[in-house]
Amino acid sequence: VIAKIANVKHHLWIGTADIKDLYVKSSSMTVPFLKVISRLIERGVEVRLIHAKEPGPNFRKDFDDYSILAKRLERVLCPRVHFKMVIFDLETAYVGSANLTGAGLGMKGERNRNFEAGVLTNAPSFVEQAINQFDFVWNGSQCKKCGRKRFCPDSPLKY
């Protein structure tokens, strides 16, 4: 999944309950995942991120190292998000249990990684359902009736 992210051409949509200062392999180096994302944005890729809670200080430090992220990363915080998905160029989708963390998709050692399961497919009906679920949250379709509005700083709706 991480290797596929680096090759996205136009659209990358990521949904995760938890996000941390994830590190990944890039060529022969280990780099912050946010460096990979910043490179995509520099190439003109639209990157959308939905996550459920504010990341910790290490993530924020990495985020601040790449100024393009503050300007062009499209981001929504929704405390009700528990899905984990990555949509690649609106043609392929990963849906599974792995959060955007070292133990989920990153480089934690074999003895410390989580046991994850997921599906990576380009089956049109599966990808369409993933896109629809992502859009449902992204567009604020549930916000008006949501019981957790007070915890949601990014709702697109004004109450």
Label every model-predicted segment.
Residues 50-52, 78, 88, 95-96, ...:
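Generic beta-sheet signal
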Residues 11, 91-92:
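Structural motif
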Residues 92-159:
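Signature of lipid phosphatidyltransferase scaffolds
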Residues 84-87, 117-119:
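Short beta-strand scaffold segments in enzyme catalytic cores
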Residues 72-74, 142:
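Conserved beta-strand segments of alpha/beta enzyme cores
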